[in-house]
Amino acid sequence: MNIQALLSEKVSHAMIAVGAPADCEPQVRQSAKAQFGDYQANGMMAVAKKMGMPPRQLAEKVLEQLDLSGIAAKVEIAGPGFINIFLAQEWLSAQIDGVLTAPKLGVAPVAPKTVVIDYSAPNVAKEMHVGHVRSTIIGDAAARTLEFLGHKVIRANHVGDWGTQFGMLIAFLEKQQSEHHEAIALADLEAFYREAKRTYDEDPAFAERARGYVVKLQGGDEYCRKMWKQLVDVTMTQNQLIYDRMNVTLTRDDVMGESLYNDMLPGIVADLKAKGLAVESEGATVVFLDEYKNKEGEPMGVIIRKKDGGYLYTTTDIACAKYRYETLKADRVLYYIDSRQHQHLMQAWTIVRKAGYVPDSIPLEHHMFGMMLGKDGKPFKTRAGGTIKLSDLLDEAVDRATKLVAEKNPDMPADELNALANIVGIGAVKYADLSKSRTTDYIFDWDNMLAFEGNTAPYMQYAYTRVLSVFRKAGIDAEAVSGVTRIVDDREAALAVRLLQFEETITQVARDGMPHVMCAYLYDLAGLFSGFYEHCPILNAEDEATKQSRLRLALLTAKTLKQGLDTLGIETVERM
């Protein structure tokens, strides 16, 4: 059910009937204030200007042609030519009944596309840290949302599994295996990497062996490949534990590391040279881009192969985009990578387009995000200034949630308390991130994210259980609600309109990759339910028909909160 689309079609039809151009934009929007109706059509200003008439005069003509019979209770013109639409309560009632029985909360099926989503992308032989939080959480919400709408989503975990550091890591793994058991060697990845680097810096013979292993690994040496694969496997096994713990849908099957594109790189460099896009410059292979200028105002040179024959991230990203279009058959590609990589990606994609590897009709979208900051406004780190491990962050979230839940439920059995604390704690970390616009930096604050009031996961999870408690108090199964919806009160109507705006909301999230829009919608919905619950008695309604009608609104609220939170990757519980 997409009210905005329905009204846009009706208003557009009326505008064309009075002489507006066929491509006119009715600009139908949800009204910000109740006095302006449920929806406003704001497109008269721009169209009237083109038609050479006052906007109000155009609005009056449009109103004469606008057929909203059975949909709107009244339509009026405000100000210079805004059209305010007040939806009819009978129509809202019928739509609620339709949505309650429809699959997917009445969200219309889409023409399915293949969407590749690049997110998370941790590095091999390093533990995931807070720097991976935003890409992982926001990317996963986008994947869940697009999948819910019916698209074929291919998750691409672009793991950092290649590069010169692997010579050092293989040499150190070999050293550790000769001295200890290999499982011990890789038990603490962070310590393993640190020790490998220290040995490399301090032991010239070790460094020499490490450099030799880089060449061998790149040449496909069997022993080096075996050691390299061991490093990748141990890392991804540890990362999978974190993904599962965070309720993130990534699996081992989604790993498409940098190494996947190695065999494509020589061919791409040769092809770019053959097409006249790349040239030799001071021993390196370079693409000069007119679209980007250096400090001297000359076309910027983007190196795709170094003097020593080594390739760069740009070369890999060119291959990666080509692979996603040609092999994965992507109709759309989303990259959840931080904003500092923007120019690098734009340069790679400019080369991709010029070479004809991905046509202009296939969007390559950088859904960038800001940084996670501490309360001091600086990048979020440990007290000692180190990087915070993601596993430590999740441990602290669960510890804090355990104390919080235990205070509110002193008699809760330990296993139930533990399960609930995990859902609340992990949900709080995820929701705190998702509820902020991804394009801005955000302050990480434990007290705010674990609060039971405001736009937080604990509040939203509690709001869901509060709706369910209505059915528990009534002693009825939620799905056993009968009767029909019969909206007669303004608060019922306001709740109904918001419930019917779920499709508009999820469509916007899918289009823009902005999960905070869903968070804001759900928070608003929970607030409207609260007002409805306080002013419209449900179990003590004046008659059985009213009671059933209000139970139907409560049921759809519960379903919408649960589904909305699920698209964000936030788990719900039946009681708190």
UniProtKB/Swiss-Prot annotation:
GO terms for biological process: arginyl-tRNA aminoacylation. Transmembrane segments: none annotated. It is an enzyme of class 6 (ligase). It is found in: Cytoplasm. InterPro entries: aa-tRNA-synth_I_CS, Arg-tRNA-ligase, Arg-tRNA-synth_N, Arg-tRNA-synth_N_sf, ArgRS_core, DALR_anticod-bd, Rossmann-like_a/b/a_fold, tRNAsynth_Ia_anticodon-bd. A motif ('HIGH' region) lies at residues 122-132. Monomer. Belongs to the class-I aminoacyl-tRNA synthetase family. This is Arginine--tRNA ligase. It comes from Erwinia tasmaniensis (strain DSM 17950 / CFBP 7177 / CIP 109463 / NCPPB 4357 / Et1/99).
